[in-house]
A protein has these predicted regions:
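FAD-binding core of flavoproteins
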Residues: 73-79, 86-197, 323-334
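Alpha-helical interface subdomain recognition
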Residues: 1-72, 181-334
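Generic hydrophobic, aliphatic-rich segments that mediate packing or membrane embedding
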Residues: 61-62, 80-84
């Protein structure tokens, strides 16, 4: 089933999510047309139970879909909406909105307002599923105050106390950083493979001193390092999504996000090294991917944060060796 979903989405993105479309949405902040195409195809309901109108898939079955969001630099929150609609369905919400939903960790202010910094795709999302230390809300972005964040489609979003009260408050609570870590790891894995493939193709096409630069040993070494990181990240993302439910395991997500974030830094640097100056230009597609590698590396915590999560798990909650923690995390049949 996961291959069928991935293949169908790949065909849709080949037609509807070209680099030109990504550039247009980044410039305008309007992803409504692309979102309409994706939503009408049913992909956003992949994690919703069949009894509630969805496909009833589990997290490991939609890894391919989330990875494609990275491979095609999808500029609308498809993976986030899949997760959000599943959580809303679990909470018994009837009539889940059809618009796009992103996820964010927020902070309730003393005046009752709610602030979220660096909301992924906050410029284009129709709503945000926000969690603080105790509560969770579904809030529209229509009347919220949005200011640009570091990545072009992200935003800092602020809701007044009245807007928070008017929003939908859920009785359940989820750690959004955990969910975003899982999503970002999968997206990174797709983007990393795309960058590697594009760089490999460029090295075979670019001729210098009478032969493709990919024939030079120094370039071959850099490509081999990129391949190592890209495929290790893919395996790590598989581990992070190794769940039969929609909520991932915290330790496995920590491993996945840490490894994919490490790979993002190395692969982005090596790809630009091989491409040279052309890779940095606006007209060349590489920057669409490498900007996201850097953004997703930081989103939800970079590798240092997730290394800390693993260290805390070992010191505070486990007995035995570090190897025992690694074995338990990587034993996906457990």
């Amino acid at each position: 089933m996961d291959d069928l979903f991935s293949d169908a989405l790949r065909q849709l993105l080949d037609d509807q999510c070209t680099p030109a479309v990504v550039r247009q949405i980044e410039a305008s902040g309007d992803g409504a047309a692309l979102w309409s195409q994706i939503d009408s195809s049913g992909f956003a309901d992949a994690l919703v139970p069949e009894a509630q109108g969805g496909a009833g898939l589990s997290l490991h079955e939609v890894l391919g879909v989330m990875a494609l969001c990275g491979r095609y630099t999808v500029p609308v929150p498809l993976a986030e909406t899949m997760m959000a609609r599943s959580l809303l369905a679990q909470a018994g919400v009837v009539g889940v909105p059809h618009g796009s939903i992103t996820l964010a960790q927020g902070q309730r202010m003393t005046d009752g307002s709610l602030m979220c910094t660096g909301v992924q795709l906050g410029r284009v999302a129709d709503a945000v599923l926000v969690s603080d230390a105790q509560h969770m809300w579904l809030l529209s972005t229509q009347d919220a105050q949005r200011t640009p964040a570091s990545f072009v489609l992200d935003a800092d979003v602020h809701w007044s106390a009245q807007q928070v009260t008017a929003g939908l408050q859920l009785t359940q609570h989820q750690d959004m950083r955990l969910l975003l870590g899982c999503i970002n790891a999968a997206q990174l894995s797709g983007a990393l493979l795309a960058v590697f493939n594009k760089t490999l193709q460029y090295a075979n096409d670019r001729v210098q001193f009478g032969k493709p630069i990919g024939k030079f040993q120094a370039i071959q070494h850099q490509l081999s390092v990129m391949a190592e990181h890209s495929f290790a990240a893919h395996m790590a993302a598989q581990l992070g999504c190794a769940s039969d439910t929609v909520v991932p395991d915290r330790v496995r997500v920590a491993v996945a996000k840490a490894r994919t974030s490490e790979a993002a830094l190395e692969v982005a640097a090596l790809s630009h090294s091989i491409h040279g100056a052309i890779g940095f230009t606006h007209e060349f597609d590489l920057q669409l991917f490498t900007r996201r590698l850097h953004a997703w590396r930081q989103a939800g915590g970079a590798e240092s944060y997730w290394h800390g999560v693993l260290g805390s798990e070992l010191v505070d909650h486990r007995q035995g060796l570090a190897l025992d923690l690694i074995r338990s995390a990587t034993d996906v049949t457990a």
